[in-house]
Amino acid sequence: FRTLTLDLPGSGLSDKPDIEYLPDQMLDFCIGFMDALQIPHATLVGNSMGAGLAIGITLTHPTRVDKLVLISGLPSQVMAKLTSRSFRQALESRAPSWLVSFGNWLFGGLVTDSVLKEIVHDHTLLTPAVIERTNQNRRRPGIIKPIMAVRNALPSWETDFAPHLSSITHPTMIIWGEHDRVFPLAVGEELHDRIRRSTFVRIPKAGHMPQWERPDLV
């Protein structure tokens, strides 16, 4: 087998076009990516919101998915189950884009530090190089709109996708860090209960990104 990773539009080093970054656009991009590389079907792996996208592809294009690996996401009733203070503040904010952009310029470093400490259990991983790379990403031109799109996409997730989690029949592995401070372990166990052909794997000494903290187990 081969492993392919991609940065979605608006993420990482990918282009940040002036689009709405709607869930349907992200789904179409992923299917277009598979089409361009002539991949008829594949096993999908997604972390957090990326897990939500993998679920969306599975529900809308079931024949393109062989198996599903969901890491730390994504449940129904996101806001009710979210325990991260930093994520909650970002998702509940109704500030306009210009104000978010100004806040990112003024306080972005503090926010980055807070978010990283919530998603990572082992803080020794948060080296100066990691923090600087994260700060470089948040300073990239055009980053605000895709960040705000995550907030705006939640209603679509709750109405169009989350209610159908129990209809997924693909073999699914759900991986969860035992010290996840974004979505607690119980949230992962509930997701496991809803997806019938799923297995649940607990990762010790890991938070919201166990693939980074415990690559030996994931």
Regions from the PLM with identified roles:
Residues 154-155, 178-183:
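Acidic catalytic loop of the alpha/beta-hydrolase fold
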Residues 182, 206-217:
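Catalytic histidine-centered segment of alpha/beta-hydrolase-like enzymes
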